[in-house]
Design a protein with these regions (language model features):
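Charge-dense, helix-prone N-terminal extensions
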Residues: 1-207
Length: 207
């Protein structure tokens, strides 16, 4: 695992697999994008280092955000992103059962440019949250069935069949995502966004 510096990470990779220091390392696919995100985080006075083989940004010793590189995208991950107000809904949980962290995914420099104003707002919030010393306490996990899902099933039998063919964990990931919105209109939009994954047999945010 690379534990030297963020510059070494961008040059050689994370060192967590056999592709370290080779063109096959996923980090090398996203160097330009990661550099833009890195500069954005440093611009607001965060301290930079490596944790778990990836760039980590802190304030007063508290973790604020990390950068990550994957096959299909790169991400900025907020450690307690669930505590932030995401008016533009650009954050997603990194996994179906994630209760604290939230990530923003990018697949190009242009996409970063489009989302950057909203990302900056999230970064400022994350810094303020870290400085406050507060610890985010997630709501108890309650699987509340969203009525908007039933409404869609009533008019789309194929979608209903596909959903009920999913594993319980994948079903739950969609339920939690949809039901997590407070407004009915937002829940309806989330149902629509989940349709392609449901039909493909995937859970929410599953790659």
């Amino acid at each position: 695992m690379n534990t030297t510096s963020v510059d070494a990470y961008l040059q050689d990779g994370c060192g967590r697999c056999e592709h370290y220091q080779s063109p096959l390392c996923k980090v090398h696919r996203w160097v330009d994008e990661l550099q833009v995100l890195r500069a954005t985080l440093l611009m607001v006075g965060l301290d930079e280092g490596l944790k778990w083989g990836a760039p980590c940004f802190t304030i007063q010793g508290r973790n604020v955000a990390m950068l990550g590189a994957y096959r299909h995208d790169c991400v900025i991950s907020f450690f307690e992103g669930a505590a932030l107000v995401d008016d533009h809904e650009i954050m997603v949980p990194p996994g179906p059962n994630s209760r604290y962290a939230r990530v923003v995914r990018f697949s190009s420099v242009d996409e970063i440019a489009q989302k950057l104003p909203h990302v900056r707002v999230l970064i400022v919030q994350a810094i303020e949250h870290a400085r406050s010393g507060d610890r985010f306490v997630p709501d108890p996990v309650v699987d509340t069935w969203p009525p908007e899902l039933d409404k869609r099933f009533a008019t789309d039998e194929a979608l209903s069949r596909a959903f009920h063919a999913l594993t319980p964990g994948r079903q739950r990931s969609h339920i939690l995502h949809i039901a997590g919105a407070k407004q009915a209109s937002t829940r309806e939009r989330r149902v629509t966004r989940c349709v392609p994954d449901i039909l493909a047999g995937k859970g929410f945010n599953e790659r």
